């Protein structure tokens, strides 16, 4: 198939729409846990094609959005130190901390760089041997192998001035946290795309069985998502809760074994505080103790006193599937992409950014 045109074929999408609306006979709340899915759902107006029984619920699928304010404050403290080049992905620069943001600090003269790839941090360290280069690494298992690859190069080449602030997180743990909340009503899940390429589909089987909820691993294109929704509808009707791999063209049961081995070589699980979800055991990654000499949280003073979230912002509720962006009183008004109050409006994968771009009201 043509990966663009065929997966956006209007006639095929409308045919799936008819099947979904015909076979869907009771409410089905589907949570996607991938920011790319959120944007595709809104961009292609899929809620209007699935009928009245299907409700898309947006979960913690954006790594920038789930970053707690305390970690942003740590980043700002490190970036403010003398003789430091601080680098991270561009979306992180605009996320507000308790008192400031990386973008504001850069405007004040601090050397803060937005990287295109983690390997750019290695080049910076080699080109600036008199500087301490700190790489603030974020992302799910999709980007963790790239950070592990960078660590490996630093170790092999004996680079002495590059440090890591690791903020990588994993998928299964937050799903368990969400499902343990008695206020959450989720009937099925759209499994992440790129994350699953690394992890494989096998890791979701335990979740599906534990919570008796079907999971469909879906690609990003509208045809992918519609086919996945149809499968979830049919599983609901049949009373089954299996893992359906719609994205089989990219996702295998065991995932990318070499990438997982590289991650395991340098990282180990740790507890991590998620925005909106609180601390979740073994949901994050950190450098192994033998590589603590590269860990910015070990080598520098990262202690901070973080303020609570803005009372006007409901990002936490959105990430738990308890609210939608349009439920927020400041959405599209005080809070917008030029002046984000919360992280869900900052990131290109955030639910609020998707609603603002594709379905803004008023």
Language-model segments: what does each one mean?
Residues 168-175, 255-258:
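Short, conserved secondary-structure transition motifs
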Residues 1-130, 144, 152-157, 165, ...:
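Metallocofactor- and cofactor-centric catalytic cores in central/energy metabolism, strongly enriched
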């Amino acid at each position: 198939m043509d990966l663009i045109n065929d997966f956006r074929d209007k006639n095929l999408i409308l045919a799936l729409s008819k099947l979904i609306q015909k076979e869907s006979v009771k409410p089905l709340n589907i949570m996607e846990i991938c920011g790319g899915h959120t944007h595709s759902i809104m961009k292609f107006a899929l809620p209007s094609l699935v009928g009245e029984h299907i409700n898309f619920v947006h979960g913690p699928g954006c790594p920038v959005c789930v970053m707690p304010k305390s970690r942003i404050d740590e980043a700002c403290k490190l970036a403010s130190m003398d003789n430091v080049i601080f680098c991270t992905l561009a979306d992180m620069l605009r996320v507000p901390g308790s008192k400031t943001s990386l973008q504001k600090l850069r405007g004040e003269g601090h050397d803060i760089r937005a990287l295109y790839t983690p390997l750019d941090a290695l080049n910076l360290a080699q080109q600036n041997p008199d500087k301490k280069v700190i790489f603030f690494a974020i992302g799910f298992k999709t980007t963790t192998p790239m950070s592990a690859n960078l660590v490996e190069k630093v170790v092999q080449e004996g680079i002495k001035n590059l440090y890591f602030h690791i903020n990588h997180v994993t998928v299964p743990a937050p799903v368990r946290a969400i499902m343990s909340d008695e206020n959450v009503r989720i009937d099925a899940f759209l499994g992440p795309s790129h994350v699953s390429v690394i992890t494989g589909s096998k890791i979701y089987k335990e979740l599906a069985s534990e919570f008796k909820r079907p999971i469909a691993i879906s690609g990003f294109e509208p045809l992918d998502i519609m086919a996945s929704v149809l499968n979830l509808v049919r599983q609901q009707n049949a009373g089954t809760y299996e893992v359906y791999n719609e994205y089989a063209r990219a996702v295998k049961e065991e995932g990318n074994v070499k990438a997982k081995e590289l991650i395991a070589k340098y990282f180990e699980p740790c507890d991590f505080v998620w925005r909106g979800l609180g601390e979740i055991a073994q949901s994050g990654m950190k450098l192994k103790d033998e590589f603590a000499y590269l860990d910015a949280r070990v080598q520098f003073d990262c202690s901070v006193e973080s303020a609570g979230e803005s009372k006007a912002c409901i990002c936490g509720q959105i990430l738990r599937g308890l609210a939608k962006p349009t439920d927020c009183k400041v959405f599209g008004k005080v809070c917008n992409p030029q002046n984000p109050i919360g992280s869900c409006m900052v990131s290109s994968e955030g639910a609020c950014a998707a609603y603002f771009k594709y379905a803004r009201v008023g």
